[in-house]
């Protein structure tokens, strides 16, 4: 039996509980949160009786194997290092840390510990994406020349997600003082991870960040100063070029990821408009000698989720992806985007 503790009992933690609880041989034995009301509600909802208000107390008194770090972003580093020092495997929500230096510290600590470490880049769960990555990595598309990727949401311009000026789950994401790195740190880390995993590392980037003024200056203690959209031109280490962008004001696009990778022997694309559950296909063309350029849609059976990969890694001792190294690389790109936008120039990564 693999025993887990969940640290942080906000809304995302429900998905962690449900996913891990559905895996045979896994038990959530304790939960921890400084917010007593959140802790009580989460424990009542999921039937977890053992609760802690302090991570120190959890590590000192509870017998378990691994943690799910679902705390706010600014606590990811501290909790992650604390868990590794206590000999616990770590499954961390993204981003791995608030900057690349902190992320590297976590990578080194994980390597020195020999413990299993993973970052929950949710959309790696999409089987269509995994199929696409396998095709690209196999070399079937030849030399990769072009990569274009977007991640668009509409919650600043529609009420599909709710009313962003009335709910704290939206408000903090718009305020740097509340720990937000804007859309770049929220969904940008996802799309950078998705673009680089099949193709390889980005060599240099030119990025422009935008704060939209139409939403107002802020609400109460929340000042709306975090970036709402960004556009980036990129060059990969392998010579490929492309564009990557994200927006929270993309009216009509609920939660839409679109990735297109083009080589000299073919092209491949994935697109899903909800969560990873509808990303079960990819489209591919190898018809380079025809004027029609026929695209074929390929269904991919469900691949293991990050949650399942984490548990399998603990059981086998072999660390699957996406690990802390992937999380650090994504954060390195995010840091470069901030620098590029501020200095209005290309930045080497």
Report each predicted region and the residues it spans:
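Predominantly a Rossmann-like dinucleotide-binding segment in NAD(P)-dependent oxidoreductases
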Residues: 123-223, 344
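Active-site loop of classical SDR/Rossmann-like NAD(P)-dependent oxidoreductases
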Residues: 296-308
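Short, Asp-centered acidic motifs that coordinate Mg2+ and/or phosphate
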Residues: 30, 50, 66, 146
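N-terminal Rossmann-like dinucleotide-binding module
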Residues: 1-46
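Beta-strand-loop-alpha-helix segment that lines the small-molecule cofactor/substrate pocket
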Residues: 66, 72-73, 77-124, 139
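Conserved SAM-binding strand-loop segment of SAM-dependent methyltransferases
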Residues: 48-55
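C-terminal helix-rich "cap/oligomerization" subdomain common to oxidoreductases
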Residues: 1, 6, 26, 66-69, ...
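Contiguous beta-strand/loop segments that form the cofactor/metal-binding neighborhood of enzyme cores
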Residues: 166, 192-276, 306-316
């Amino acid at each position: 039996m693999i025993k887990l503790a969940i640290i942080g009992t906000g809304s995302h933690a429900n998905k962690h509980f449900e996913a891990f609880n559905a895996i045979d041989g896994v038990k959530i034995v304790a939960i921890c949160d400084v917010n007593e009301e959140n802790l009580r509600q989460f424990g009542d909802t999921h039937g977890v009786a053992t609760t802690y208000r302090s991570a120190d107390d959890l590590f000192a008194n509870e017998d378990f194997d691994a943690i799910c770090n679902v705390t706010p972003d600014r606590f990811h580093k501290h909790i992650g290092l604390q868990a590794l020092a206590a000999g616990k495997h770590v499954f961390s929500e993204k981003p791995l840390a608030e900057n690349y230096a902190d992320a590297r510290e976590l990578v080194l600590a994980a390597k020195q510990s020999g413990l299993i470490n993973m970052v929950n880049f949710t959309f790696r769960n999409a089987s269509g994406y995994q199929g696409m990555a396998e095709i690209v990595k196999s070399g079937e598309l030849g030399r990769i020349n072009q990569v274009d990727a977007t991640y668009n949401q509409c919650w600043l311009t529609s009420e599909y997600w709710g009313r962003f000026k009335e709910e704290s789950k939206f408000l903090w994401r718009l305020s740097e003082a509340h720990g937000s790195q804007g859309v770049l740190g929220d969904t940008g880390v996802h799309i950078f991870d998705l673009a680089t995993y099949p193709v390889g590392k980005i060599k240099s980037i030119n990025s422009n960040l935008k704060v939209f003024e139409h939403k107002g200056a802020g609400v109460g203690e929340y000042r709306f100063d975090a970036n709402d959209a960004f556009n980036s031109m990129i060059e990969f280490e392998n010579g490929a070029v492309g564009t990557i962008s994200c927006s929270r004001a993309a009216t009509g696009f609920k939660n839409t990821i679109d990735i297109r990778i083009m080589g000299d022997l073919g092209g491949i694309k994935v697109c899903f408009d909800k969560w990873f559950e509808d990303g079960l296909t990819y489209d591919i063309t190898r018809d380079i000698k025809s004027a029609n350029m026929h695209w074929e849609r390929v269904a991919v059976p469900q691949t293991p989720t990050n949650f399942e990969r984490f548990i399998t890694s603990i059981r086998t001792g072999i660390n699957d992806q996406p690990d802390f190294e992937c999380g650090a690389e994504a954060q390195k790109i995010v840091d470069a985007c901030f620098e590029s936008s501020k200095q209005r120039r290309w930045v080497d990564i």
